[in-house]
Amino acid sequence: MNYRNITLIFLLSALFGCDKFAGVKVTETFNIENTYSELYVSNAINVVISDTAEEVKVTTGENLLPNVIIEEKDDILDIRLKDGTYFFNSTVNIELPVNPNLTKLTLSNASDIEGDVNAEELTINLRNASDAKLKGYVKKLTLNLKDASGIKKNIINNRYGLSCDECAVSMKDASDAYIHCDGTIRIVKLSGASDLHYTGNAEIILTGSTSSSSDIKHDVL
């Protein structure tokens, strides 16, 4: 084997074997006030909202853990990685207690969230291929989705799991949403091959632009 081949093998091993540098999986708990009303998640972090959780649990590689930031300031809980952090093929999973005060949820950079939500008003902002798989009831729901993000399909008793009385929708860039509504759905913007799927007997109100590549679909399950 010549020097060039040895060098190539070493480089490939370094590239595809980086995951070991994240270390073995460990779990650490964090105490927060849980009085925040806005939740921000970024850097491809996965969050689960659990009704059995009493504190924040972070599960990830032992070497990656010190780079996870959970910052509660004023009304905002910000979950992210330190700038410049990158571990190949590694994951950060976070379990959060249910927060009845939540009014805004913002995910970016391929982050995911799932769990129960119940609120009078809730704004969900998803961008950069982020996804939310939620169930529960929100009286007044606002959806702002872009960059191939989505409210994922979650079927409960022949209807989609995220239910609302009113919904304002703005979606673009091949984003999708699945909701249940028996009230009104106001379409502010729907473009770029984005689709809104809904169950229920909602009245659709068009107040903004809708492109021919996008669709509003009344699904019967």
What spans do the regions from the language model cover?
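Intrinsically disordered, low-complexity terminal regions
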Residues: M1-L221
